[in-house]
Every structure is written in structure tokens, then in C-alpha cells.
Amino acid sequence: MLRLDLQFFASKKGVGSTKNGRDSESKRLGAKRADGQFVTGGSILYRQRGTKIYPGENVGRGGDDTLFAKIDGAVKFERFGRDRKKVSVYPVAQ
């Protein structure tokens, strides 16, 4: 009697899953208005986490550290102290 020893191999490759391939959505942080630009009161000037830039004249700070203009005027990014920055809004005479 003739015995056949057959071995079958997979015709389709098994596909494993990966634990990579996802990332959080970007938060669009940073400057929203340029130095010297005219803004209206309530305009967002800078979005940040923590106080990378401090509020100066006529600028408020929101609960998430966003800096916004309190009055209509021109934006001015300034340095104060040795290594700190602030943003101010100065009224423009018309």
C-alpha cells in the first residue's frame, strides 16, 4: 500500500494588527496676530499652554492661557526682563 504524506501551506498570509498608527489632533497653538497688526477688542492674539508669553498692556489671559486684546489697537510683541516676552495692544490715534 502506498502512503502519501501531504502537508498543506497557507494560501493566504495571516495579517496581524499593529498598536501604532494613531496620533492626537493638533491644537493649533501659537501666534494668531502679527506685530504691528491692528486688532479689535476680544481678538485672540496668542494660543499657548502655560505662560510662554505674558499679557502686557490691554491684554487679558483666558482660562487656557490664551492671550486676547481688551481694546482696539495695534499689537506689539515686547521683551521684558532678561528672558521673558509679553504682548501688548496700544490704542491707535485716528
Swiss-Prot record:
Signal peptide: none annotated. One of its GO terms (molecular function) is structural constituent of ribosome. This is Large ribosomal subunit protein bL27. One of its GO terms (cellular component) is cytosolic large ribosomal subunit. Pfam families: Ribosomal_L27. Belongs to the bacterial ribosomal protein bL27 family. Residues 1-9 form a propeptide. Keywords: Ribonucleoprotein, Ribosomal protein. GO terms for biological process: translation. The N-terminus is cleaved by ribosomal processing cysteine protease Prp.
